[in-house]
Amino acid sequence: MRMKKCPKCGKYTLKDFCSGCNEKSVTIKPPRFSPVDKYGKYRRALKKAKM
């Protein structure tokens, strides 16, 4: 059983069809892990600015 997402409305589900719009849901993949964080400096700057 994998998590799926409706491409039309963006809802997440475990079913083959979206309960909201009856569109066929697709399997989602997480972003690839990399020890080199390309956007880390931007994320840290935003976090520092919010404090």
Curated annotation (Swiss-Prot):
Pfam family, one: Nop10p
Keyword Nucleotidyltransferase carried by entry: no
GO cellular component assignments: ribonucleoprotein complex
A GO MF label: snoRNA binding
Record-linked SUPFAM superfamilies: Nop10-like SnoRNP
GO biological process: pseudouridine synthesis; rRNA processing
Keywords from the named record: Ribonucleoprotein, Ribosome biogenesis, rRNA processing
KW Transferase (keyword) present: no
InterPro entries attached to this UniProt entry: H/ACA_rnp_Nop10 (IPR007264), H/ACA_rnp_Nop10_sf (IPR036756), Nop10_arc-typ (IPR023532)
Record-stated family: Belongs to the NOP10 family.
Role: Involved in ribosome biogenesis; more specifically in 18S rRNA pseudouridylation and in cleavage of pre-rRNA.
NCBIfam families: PRK13130.1
Name of this protein: Ribosome biogenesis protein Nop10
Native source species: Methanococcus maripaludis (strain C7 / ATCC BAA-1331)
